[in-house]
């Protein structure tokens, strides 16, 4: 019987060890990327804005200006106009021609933004507009400075192969074509441009990711990239929902006009001076070029990245399990923003003791602020966050300015 007693004793000990193997651990996960930036202070905001402006200027120069692609929105108009102007001013010296091109490509966009900046100041708010204006001016001034550096007009490495295509060989033989040939969209029927077209899509994807990330961070900081973004932010804040589909159509219309100017018309003018390619001028396939498709690919990729990194109009339910229920409640009530707030009765699963928890429905972007307030009162409480697929009714939203 001793062996039986020892066996049961060992089993009991094993159970105890298994139970004691469980330990209390702190788990932290976030529904938001760059969550720390939602509460960034003013000096940090401006520092990040200028860094983003510098990065965007570089990528815009290398991945858009030099590749025949376009940005999205109003900036595409100034880009298309600058390309058309470059082709038309072929009688100017190269230095003057490039200077005029860069002024209209970069600095003219700042001028176009002036009425939109005034609109934003009156309709959206002071802080938002000032921060956005810093970005608009800085990114385009940086871009202009980069563009006038000697050698800045050199093609990216993967696109330099365009100089070895059949089209480029014929363009070099034509009189007065020179750099204007770079503004001719890639041609579907020129098999020698196959590798260059693939490279263009790669560059479009890279720029789409970088641009989407930059835009998301700007939105998180409480600013935008200017242009049509001012209108986007105004309608989004007024309607308290994303107006992406409507603005996508508006920006697409603007982009089509830009491509008509900077690629279709400008490209056709250049092709008329190249004997073997005269027939390609003013053809429909010149408009529906690889450049157009790659541009839309970049735009869609940008939108996808922004939606993932800045889910502004997504909602979540927050449950706070704390023994300091009254202190947390008062802290939330004393916050500058009004939060939806309810208290529910619960029962402990082990002790069967009655407890209470705080429940709040809020936007994703408000979660870091709520957790910060709660943690000031109770560093050890459990905060549960659940995504909400849909919502219908009134809810308190923090003022944006």
From Swiss-Prot:
Transmembrane segments: 44-64, 69-89, 99-119, 130-150, 201-221, 246-266, 286-306
Annotated keywords: Cell membrane, Membrane, Transmembrane, Transmembrane helix
Main location per the UniProt record: membrane
Gene3D superfamilies: 3.30.70.120
Pfam families per record: DUF2179, YitT_membrane
Membrane topology according to the record: Multi-pass membrane protein
InterPro entries found in the cross-reference section: DUF2179, N-reg_PII/ATP_PRibTrfase_C, UPF0750_membrane, YitT
Keyword Membrane: yes
Places the protein is found: Cell membrane
A single Gene Ontology CC term: plasma membrane
PANTHER family: UPF0750 MEMBRANE PROTEIN YITT (PTHR33545:SF5), UPF0750 MEMBRANE PROTEIN YITT-RELATED (PTHR33545)
Protein name (Swiss-Prot/TrEMBL): Uncharacterized protein MG443 homolog
Species of the source: Mycoplasma pneumoniae (strain ATCC 29342 / M129 / Subtype 1) (Mycoplasmoides pneumoniae)
């Amino acid at each position: 019987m001793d062996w039986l007693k020892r066996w049961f004793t060992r089993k009991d000990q094993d159970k105890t060890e298994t139970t004691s193997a469980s330990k209390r651990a702190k788990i932290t996960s976030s529904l938001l990327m760059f969550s720390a930036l939602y509460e960034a202070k003013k000096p940090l905001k401006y520092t990040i804005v200028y860094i983003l402006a510098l990065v965007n200027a570089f990528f815009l120069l290398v991945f858009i200006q030099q590749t025949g692609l376009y940005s999205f929105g109003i900036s595409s108009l100034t880009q298309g106009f600058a390309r058309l102007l470059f082709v038309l001013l072929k009688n100017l010296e190269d230095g003057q021609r490039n200077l005029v091109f860069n002024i209209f490509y970069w600095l003219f966009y700042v001028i176009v933004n002036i009425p939109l900046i005034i609109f934003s100041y009156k309709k959206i708010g002071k802080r938002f507009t000032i921060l956005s204006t810093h970005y608009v001016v800085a990114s385009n001034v940086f871009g202009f400075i980069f563009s006038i550096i000697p050698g800045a007009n050199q093609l990216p490495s993967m696109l330099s192969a365009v100089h070895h295509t059949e089209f480029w060989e014929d363009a070099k033989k034509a009189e007065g074509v020179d750099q204007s040939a770079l503004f001719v969209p890639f041609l579907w029927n020129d098999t020698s441009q196959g590798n260059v077209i693939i490279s263009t899509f790669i560059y479009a994807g890279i720029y789409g990711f970088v641009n989407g990330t930059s835009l998301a961070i700007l939105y998180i900081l409480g600013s935008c990239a200017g242009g049509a973004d001012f209108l986007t932010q105004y309608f989004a804040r007024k309607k308290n929902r994303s107006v992406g589909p409507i603005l996508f159509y508006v920006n697409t219309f603007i982009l089509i006009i830009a491509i008509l100017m900077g690629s279709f018309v400008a490209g056709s003018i250049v092709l008329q001076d190249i004997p073997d390619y005269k027939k390609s001028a003013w053809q429909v396939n010149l408009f529906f070029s690889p450049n157009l498709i790659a541009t839309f690919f970049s735009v869609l990729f940008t939108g996808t990245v922004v939606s993932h990194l800045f889910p502004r109009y997504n909602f979540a339910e927050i449950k706070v399990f704390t023994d300091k229920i009254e202190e947390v409640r008062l802290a939330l009530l004393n916050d500058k923003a009004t939060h939806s707030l309810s208290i529910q009765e619960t029962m402990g699963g082990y002790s069967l003791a009655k407890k209470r928890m705080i429940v709040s429905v809020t936007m994703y972007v408000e979660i870091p602020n709520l957790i910060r307030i709660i943690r000031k009162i109770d560093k050890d409480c459990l905060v549960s966050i659940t995504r909400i697929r849909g919502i219908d009714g009134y809810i308190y939203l923090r003022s944006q300015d």
